[in-house]
Regions:
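Short hydrophobic alpha-helices and adjacent helix-cap/hinge residues
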Residues: 1-348
């Protein structure tokens, strides 16, 4: 689910960043330099006379601002890999301010603009980019289940022109339920509200339902065809229930869930710490900025000649647990010590 870009008012602990070294690039540079020393002066001057244009990266998402955390993470990661904004790469950013219907035309516009690569966030943007082109490489982030959504053929062999970073929505479903019920042990019914157009949500629902049975919880999936159904579905939520809000493509859906959660004092768990800053109780899932940095490695490889179909889809490397202590206090919940010790971020 794409969200408004904003500075996150979170206190972070135990950050783990996974960096990919540049040893191969350094070796290649050294061999090139040695070869140039053996050429006559005129041959050495030719590369200086031919300036290659920067790679053009198209960005497609449903964010409310150009400076979304995944995009900022991508820029930082590319810089670490020797591809600097303005010198080696430029960005054509198309964000649709939460309007999913505007995403397909934006994808087609990027293809017509002849970008070298399209960087997407969330399933709707990734699917639109895939529908718009079979030749321009696509690198995605924040897609919960790329195989289940039909975006790639498999994790190891994506096929086609698409690869990227999975946010592991299916794999993390049971853990989110566990965290939610640890914070609110009296809960017996959990509403799983999702956007029906996010096809990758279905495998996650199965995992959540299986986990609910083990925990003796009633898991009630509620799919929305569009935002107009949201009020009706949220109207069924009662005090004593809880909400599991999976990652999706509609930020309006998440904001509405937070508002309903606060109004009824109903605990809700989210897929990223970003929503804790808006009043959500707890989140367990990938960090947006870190996913952008991780995706930078795939982007750099493709810009330097690799094919997307040869680059396996990666799982998000950094998973954060975040708790809004103010919301917990509002709900009358005592945050267990084991949650406090494991949490990577807090909102006070």
């Amino acid at each position: 689910m794409m969200a408004p870009s904003s500075a996150r008012p979170l206190r972070r602990f135990g950050h783990q960043l996974f960096w990919v070294g540049a040893a191969i690039t350094v070796c290649a540079w050294a061999l090139t330099a040695q070869a140039q020393q053996q050429k006559p002066p005129q041959a050495q001057q030719e590369p200086q006379q031919q300036t290659r244009r920067p790679f053009r990266i198209g960005v497609l998402n449903a964010a409310w601002a150009a400076s979304h955390p995944t995009v900022e993470g991508l820029k930082a990661g590319l810089k670490e890999l020797g591809l600097e904004d303005g010198r080696d790469v430029t960005f054509d950013i198309r964000f649709t301010e939460g309007k999913l219907s505007a995403i397909p035309p934006a994808a087609e516009a990027l293809v017509k603009a002849r970008v070298d690569l399209i960087f997407t966030s969330q399933e709707a943007a990734t699917q639109a980019a895939k529908d718009a082109t079979e030749s321009v490489p696509i690198v995605f982030t924040l897609v919960g289940d790329p195989v289940g959504a039909g975006i790639v053929a498999s994790i190891a062999r994506p096929g086609g022109n698409v690869t990227g970073i999975s946010s592991l929505q299916t794999e993390l479903a049971a853990k989110r339920l566990e965290v939610l019920t640890t914070l609110a042990p009296a809960v017996r019914r959990v509403w799983l509200i999702y956007y029906q157009l996010d096809l990758g949500t279905q495998p996650m629902i199965v995992k959540a339902f299986e986990a609910g049975q083990r925990m003796k919880l009633e898991v009630s999936p509620k799919g929305l065809a569009d935002a107009t159904e949201l009020k009706r579905v949220l109207g069924e939520v009662r005090r004593g229930d809880a909400i599991l809000a999976p990652e999706g493509s509609s930020p309006e859906l998440t904001i509405a869930i937070i508002e309903r959660s606060l109004a009824l004092k109903v605990p809700a768990a989210f897929g990223t710490a970003l929503w804790i800053g808006y009043g959500g109780l707890v989140s367990y899932g990938p960090d947006y900025y870190a996913q952008g940095m991780q995706a930078a490695t795939l982007v750099a490889k493709i810009l330097r000649g690799a094919k997307p179909q040869d680059l396996p889809v990666e799982g998000a490397e950094r998973i954060d647990l975040a708790v809004n202590l103010k919301t917990a206090d509002l709900f009358g919940l005592s945050v267990p010590r084991k949650i406090l010790l494991r949490a990577d971020a807090f909102r006070r």
